[in-house]
C-alpha cells in the first residue's frame, strides 16, 4: 500500500478525514455521523508487510455500531488495490449455493445501505466492515459492582488500619510522613495479589456474572502532611489522592518533588496507594502476561480492583474515625472536597478513577492519555517490554494486532473505557459536574500527545491557545476539534506545556531527541498554580499571559 498515493488521512490534518472523498472513512451506522480519524502504516515492521492502522481521533460511543470503508487505495506500483473475492461477492450483490456465504448477506446489505446514506458510493469500496462497540455494562459493570460492594462494606465496618511508619520532616517541605495499611475486601481470587483474577460465584463465570467479595486484605497507603500545616497551625488542608506512574509505587508521593511542592503551595494533604495491576508489585505478572497474552485478564481485573482501592482510600480520608484521625497526624485540620492528581500512568488511570469515584469531581491529569493500544507503539517505555514479548511473538504484525485486541480488556482497567462518562452520561452513583485539567508535555517521549488530544476531544474539553509557538506543531490546525478556553472558564481543559523538546515523529514510532519533556510541566511552579486554581476554585486561570505555555526543563 502506498500511503501517499492512497491519500491516507494523517493526524496532522484530521479535517481531511471528514472530506467527501476521504480514502478511509468511519461512520456511525445509526446516525450517519462521520468520525475523524487518521490512518497509517506501522513504521517498525522490518521485512514484514506493514499493517494499516486506522485510529479514530475521538472515543467511539458505548454500544454504538460503526462501519469502516476504504476506497481509492493504491499499491506502491500505482495500481488500485484489488478487493478480495469475498468482499466483491457481497459488494456486487452476488448470490451463491453456499449457504455459509449467503448467511451474512442481510448484515452486509445493512452496512452498505448505511454507507450509501452517508454518501459513500458502494461501487467504489475496496473494503468495508462494521462492528459494535462494547456496551457500558460490558465496560463498567464489573467495577461498579466492586465499588458498590466495597463501599457498602466500609459503611458497615469500623475502619481498620495500622500505622507502620511515622517519619517527621521526611523532606524539607514535609511536616510528617505517615505510612500504613488499611483493611479492605478484595474481589480477586486468593489474597488478591498480582496474577489473580476476579472471583465469581461460579468457577465458569458467564459474560453477565459479576465479581464477589473475597478475602479481607491489607492495602498499603502513605500520606504526607505539608510543612505549611505546622508553620501555620490555622491552615486548613485540602484532602487529595495522588496516582503514581508506570509500574511505580505509592512512595512517588514522597520522591516526586512536584507532589510535595503542590501540597506546600496549595495546602494539600495527599495520600496514595499502589495502582494494583500496574504497580511495582505487578512487574513480574506484566512480564508473564507479555510472554503469554492469555494471562492478560489478570492485569485488567486487578487494575479495576486498584481503582476501587483508591476510591476506598479517599473515603477513609474523609471518615471521622478514618486514617486522618490517627494521632500520628497531629492536630491538623482537613476539610473540603476530595480531589485527585496523578502523572503519566497516574494521568491515564486517573481518568477511570474520576469517572467511577462517587467523591471526586475535580482532577488534574499530568501527561495523560487514554488507550494503551495507541500509546505503547509510540512510547520509549515500550521498547524494553516489547523485547520481552518478542521471543513468544516474533512477528511485529502479530504483536501490533495483539496489543490492539488486548485493549478490549484494558478498556475496563484504564481511562479508555470510561472516557464517555466523565463530563457526560455519568455512571451510577457519581457526581454530575466532573471536570479534569490535562497538562501535556509537548514532544513527550513516553505518553504521546496524540492520545491526549483524543482524550480531550472525547471529553469535550477546551484547549488553551495559542497551543504552541508558530513552527512548533506539525498540525495544520493545532488542537483541531477543540474550542478555545478563556480565563475564568469552568469545565475540562487541556493545556500544552512546551519545554523545547523535538516534535514527535509522523509515524508509528517513539520520539527521539536528547530531552524527554515528560516531567517538565509538573515541575513548573506556574503550572502548579494553574492546577490549584482548577482543583480548589473550579476555574481555569491563564498563567501564560495569552502566550504559548512554556516550561523549564527538569533536572
Annotate each PLM feature.
Residues 316, 324-377:
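Primarily recognizes the serine-hydrolase "nucleophile elbow" in alpha/beta-hydrolase
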Residues 192-218, 231-329:
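Cap/lid segment of the alpha/beta-hydrolase catalytic domain
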Amino acid at each position: 500500500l502506498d500511503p501517499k498515493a492512497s491519500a491516507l488521512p494523517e493526524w496532522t490534518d484530521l479535517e481531511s478525514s471528514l472530506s467527501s472523498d476521504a480514502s478511509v472513512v468511519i461512520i456511525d451506522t445509526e446516525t450517519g455521523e462521520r468520525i475523524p480519524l487518521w490512518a497509517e502504516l506501522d513504521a517498525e515492521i522490518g521485512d514484514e508487510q506493514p499493517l494499516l492502522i486506522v485510529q479514530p481521533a475521538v472515543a467511539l460511543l458505548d454500544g454504538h455500531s460503526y462501519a469502516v470503508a476504504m476506497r481509492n487505495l493504491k499499491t506502491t506500483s500505482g495500481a488500485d488495490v484489488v478487493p478480495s473475492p469475498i468482499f466483491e461477492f457481497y459488494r456486487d450483490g452476488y448470490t451463491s449455493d453456499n449457504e455459509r456465504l449467503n448467511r451474512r448477506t442481510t448484515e452486509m446489505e445493512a452496512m452498505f445501505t448505511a454507507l450509501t446514506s452517508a454518501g459513500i458510493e458502494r461501487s467504489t469500496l475496496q473494503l468495508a466492515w462494521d462492528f459494535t462497540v462494547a456496551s457500558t455494562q460490558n465496560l463498567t459493570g464489573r467495577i461498579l459492582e466492586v465499588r458498590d460492594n466495597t463501599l457498602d462494606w466500609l459503611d458497615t465496618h469500623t475502619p481498620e488500619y495500622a500505622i507502620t511508619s511515622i517519619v517527621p520532616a521526611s523532606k524539607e517541605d514535609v511536616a510528617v510522613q505517615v505510612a500504613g495499611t488499611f483493611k479492605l475486601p478484595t474481589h480477586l481470587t486468593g489474597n488478591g495479589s498480582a496474577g489473580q483474577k476476579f472471583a465469581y460465584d461460579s468457577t465458569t463465570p458467564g459474560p453477565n456474572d459479576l465479581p464477589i467479595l473475597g478475602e479481607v486484605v491489607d492495602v498499603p497507603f502513605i500520606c504526607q502532611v505539608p510543612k505549611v500545616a505546622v508553620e501555620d497551625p490555622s491552615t486548613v488542608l485540602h484532602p487529595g489522592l495522588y496516582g503514581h506512574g508506570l509500574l511505580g509505587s505509592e512512595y512517588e508521593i514522597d520522591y516526586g518533588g512536584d507532589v510535595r511542592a503542590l501540597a506546600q503551595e496549595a495546602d494539600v494533604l495527599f495520600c496514595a496507594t499502589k495502582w494494583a495491576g500496574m504497580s511495582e508489585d505487578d512487574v513480574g505478572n506484566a512480564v508473564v502476561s507479555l510472554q503469554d497474552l492469555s494471562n492478560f485478564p489478570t492485569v485488567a481485573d486487578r487494575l479495576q480492583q486498584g481503582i476501587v482501592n483508591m476510591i476506598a482510600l479517599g473515603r477513609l480520608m474523609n471518615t471521622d474515625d478514618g486514617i486522618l484521625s490517627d494521632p500520628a497526624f497531629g492536630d491538623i485540620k482537613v476539610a473540603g472536597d476530595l480531589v485527585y492528581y496523578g502523572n503519566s500512568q497516574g494521568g491515564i488511570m486517573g481518568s477511570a478513577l474520576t469517572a467511577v469515584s462517587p467523591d471526586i469531581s475535580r482532577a488534574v491529569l499530568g501527561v495523560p492519555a487514554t488507550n494503551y493500544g495507541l500509546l505503547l507503539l509510540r512510547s520509549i517505555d515500550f521498547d524494553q517490554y516489547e523485547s520481552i514479548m518478542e521471543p513468544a511473538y516474533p512477528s511485529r504484525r502479530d504483536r501490533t494486532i495483539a496489543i490492539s485486541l488486548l485493549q478490549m480488556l484494558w478498556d475496563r482497567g484504564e481511562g479508555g473505557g470510561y472516557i464517555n462518562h466523565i463530563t457526560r452520561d455519568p455512571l451510577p452513583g457519581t457526581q454530575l459536574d466532573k471536570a479534569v485539567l490535562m497538562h501535556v508535555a509537548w514532544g513527550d517521549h513516553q505518553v504521546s500527545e496524540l492520545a491526549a488530544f483524543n482524550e480531550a476531544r472525547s471529553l469535550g474539553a477546551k484547549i488553551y491557545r495559542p497551543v504552541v509557538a508558530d513552527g512548533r506543531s506539525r498540525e495544520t490546525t493545532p488542537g483541531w476539534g477543540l474550542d478555545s478556553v478563556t480565563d475564568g472558564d469552568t469545565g475540562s481543559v487541556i493545556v500544552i506545556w512546551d519545554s523545547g523538546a523535538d516534535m514527535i515523529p509522523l509515524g508509528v514510532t517513539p520520539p527521539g531527541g536528547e530531552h524527554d519533556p515528560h516531567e517538565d510541566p509538573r515541575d513548573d511552579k506556574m503550572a502548579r498554580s494553574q492546577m490549584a486554581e482548577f482543583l480548589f476554585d473550579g476555574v481555569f486561570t491563564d498563567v501564560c499571559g495569552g502566550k504559548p505555555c512554556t516550561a523549564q526543563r527538569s533536572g
